[in-house]
Amino acid sequence: MNAWEVNFDGLVGLTHHYAGLSFGNEASTRHCFQVSNPRLAAKQGLLKMKTLADAGFPQAVIPPHERPFIPVLRQLGFSGSDEQVLEKVARQAPHWLSSASSASPMWVANAATIAPSADTLDGKVHLTVANLNNKFHRSLEAPVTESLLKAIFNDEEKFSVHSALPQVALLGDEGAANHNRLGGHYGEPGIQLFVYGREEGNDTRPSRYPARQTREASEAVARLNQVNPQQVIFAQQNPDVIDQGVFHNDVIAVSNRQVLFCHQQAFARQSQLLANLRSRVNGFMAIEVPAAQVSVSDAVSTYLFNSQLLSRDDGSMMLVLPQECREHAGVWRYLNELLAADNPISSLKVFDLRESMANGGGPACLRLRVVLTEEERRAVNPAVMMNDTLFNALNDWVDRYYRDRLTAADLADPQLLREGREALDTLTQLLDLGSVYPFQREGGGNG
């Protein structure tokens, strides 16, 4: 059956700031306490969405979360009115305010893991929300992510949205950022490659930085998503590259159809994994980047592999990259050699995503890939699909509500909280989502 990959991109939130919350993510740590520009960040993301939509790649949007997230601050013992909660936490424990204000939901590659209907036992599209257990600020996301996905994929005959796994380290799950799908045409059954960093009882694990994904979680997600067991491979990421800042697999590998584009050192027992894929995926092609040409360190600093590999109608592929790749002489030289070589990648598209990149999120972090048949695509909430009208409406919305300068100290401003809630109330109406945010359900909004 014919199917297409639709990229659902996360819209950057109003509290986008640099706080170094993500140990193991070197860009996040390096840019801690810099001044951010939320308006520019949102516009950089919107421009990527619109440019790809105009080039013929189906594109949709997932909205940001409510931030600062007052309910979690109350859970941590700060009481009073919302304004009093902000004032108290800013004075007594500002690090909690930063965590509760993180715009990290914009990286929707971590929102969920997807199984297309061609791969599932019941013929539905399955989406399992990620618990993001390893980082406090990200562990807050799952409930609202679930509400958003249910409002977007709201036809229960075609879509099953599953709640996140229990919030324990043993079941740490980081979503699609540790998941690849390989195969022929999108509508044909594919092989799902689940990538984990550690498993119980196995001493092969990183020592410097945390392995956020467990094998136990990957196995549970495959079960929840009802993936045909014949179509699943579990593979361990190389712990050495996790210790060099590769905190998700999408920082060291990206797949599309029959192609796996990855670093030579991406996986533990890599030659064995590639042989397995070669035997199970027709026409499988591994494009392994040698360490001698691009080091792991350069891959992390440029986000070469946190790229999008997109298929054109003629079977050729386009690699969507952050500007940092073009600015690195060695990486750009490699990419031009790649274009000249015998492989499906025939063009490069570069975007300026500096605001997101400074927090450790490139093009692939910002998108959730969902393979849909024509019938399934028609069942998606149409208001989230990117087109001229939505692009203009969202740009105007960003201009109206977003600040162009934000520091950690600004997070305590009650006006920022009010601006954010008003903005999200307007956005839920624009995207026809209903009341998906806690503040709306408590009567604070009219969505």
Curated annotation (Swiss-Prot):
One of its GO terms (molecular function) is N-succinylarginine dihydrolase activity. The keyword Hydrolase applies. Its EC number is 3.5.3.23. This is N-succinylarginine dihydrolase. Homodimer. Keywords: Arginine metabolism, Hydrolase. The lineage of its organism: Bacteria, Pseudomonadati, Pseudomonadota, Gammaproteobacteria, Enterobacterales. It catalyses: N(2)-succinyl-L-arginine + 2 H2O + 2 H(+) = N(2)-succinyl-L-ornithine + 2 NH4(+) + CO2.
